[in-house]
Amino acid sequence: MVAPVPAKRGRKPAATTAPVTGQVQSLTRGLKLLEWIAESNGSVALTELAQQAGLPNSTTHRLLTTMQQQGFVRQVGELGHWAVGAHAFIVGSSFLQSRNLLAIVHPILRKLMEDSGETVNLAVLDQSDHQAIIIDQVQCTQLMRMSAPIGGKLPMHASGAGKAFLSQLSEEQVTSLLHRKGLHAYTHATLVSPLHLKDDLAQTRKRGYSFDDEEHALGLRCVASCIYDEHREPFAALSISGPCSRITDDRVTELGAMVIKAAKEVTLAYGGTR
C-alpha cells in the first residue's frame, strides 16, 4: 500500500509568466512551456498549453515547433499532443553528471533507509523557481510507505526538504518568497501563517533538521536536513518520510539525528562544507 501523494492542482493562466526586465520573452515562454509539459508526466494538448501560458494557439505552436526542431519536445499520439523530448533529458542529466551526485549519494540513501526503516529522498533546490525537486529515492520495504515521483516538486513551506531550504534563507528572503508564492493549505496542518512558519524555521535552524507534520499530506511525516556545497550554500536535502503510525513523536528526534548525520556525510563526500 502506498501512502497518498497530494494530487496536482490546476494552474492559473500565466499572468506571472511575463518576463522580468532583462529576460528574453520568447525564451522565457518556451522554457515555461517545457516545464509545464514535464510536470504533466505525459503529454499535453496545444490548447491547454496555450491557456496556461495565456498565449494564442499560433504563438504557442510556433514556440513548440522551435523546441521540437532542437529535440526538447515531441508530438505523440493521433491527437498530436506534446511531450518532453530526449534532448531535454540529456541537458537535465548533465546537472547530476557534473559532480556525479547520485553515485555519491545513493549508497548513503540506501543505508539511511536500512537504519531508519523508512523511505529516504534526495531533493535539490531549483533556484529559478524556489522549489524542491526529488531526484532520487530509496523506498522502504514496509507495505505502507511514502511514494513520490522522481522529478516531483515539493512546496517550500509544506515539506521537509522545502522547509530545510527555507531555514537557510534570511528573514528578508523568506518574506519576499512568501509574498511571491503565497502559503497554500495542502492540509489542515499546513502552516499558512507567515509568523507561524517563521517560528517553525527558527526551530529548524536550532535543531538542524526540519519537520513536516502532516503539512503536505495527511498521515505522513517527514524530517529533512540540507547538504552544502564548497561555498557553504545549501543545494540539496535528504529526507526521511513515513506514516504517522511509525514516525511517532518519540521517533522524530531519533530520525532527525539520523538525517543530520547522513546529510553531513554527503556534504563531506561531495567536497562541501558547512
Curated annotation (Swiss-Prot):
Residues 1-21 are annotated as: Disordered. Residues 101-272 form the IclR-ED domain. GO terms for molecular function: DNA binding; DNA-binding transcription factor activity. Keywords: DNA-binding, Glyoxylate bypass, Repressor, Transcription, Transcription regulation. Glyoxylate binds at G160, A161, D212, C222, S239, I240, S241. Residues 46-65 bind DNA. Residues 24-86 form the HTH iclR-type domain. It comes from the Bacteria. GO terms for biological process: glyoxylate cycle; negative regulation of DNA-templated transcription. Regulation of the glyoxylate bypass operon, which encodes isocitrate lyase, malate synthase as well as isocitrate dehydrogenase kinase/phosphorylase. NCBIfam families: PRK11569.1. This is Acetate operon repressor. It comes from Salmonella typhimurium (strain LT2 / SGSC1412 / ATCC 700720).
